[in-house]
């Protein structure tokens, strides 16, 4: 199953489109038979804009904020799910979506994204790498 990460309704209204959904639909058109688009995830509540949040704050912001819609739970159970996103920054959204899919019994969950932001190198990280 190709499972796009959910776009917040407010973001969809503001932009007028759903780029992650569009990406997943385009990907599904190029897949062999048996691989299906499954817009199975939804937000359970509003979340703060993630743009200025650090890794820990992003994870806390998203904790419990994504679930599998009832109508998709049977389909997801036991299935291999490919999460689709446009950009991965810290991985917090992918982690929360993975948690939601596994909670209803997804078989395997993997992630696919068009781009990823580079990790910020902090003095502590540099010191840790030098010590290794």
Regions of interest found by a model, annotated:
Residues 86:
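Active-site glycine-centered loops adjacent to acidic/histidine catalytic or metal-binding residues
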Residues 1-83, 92-132:
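Conserved PRPP/pyrophosphate-binding segment of the phosphoribosyltransferase/PRPP-pathway fold
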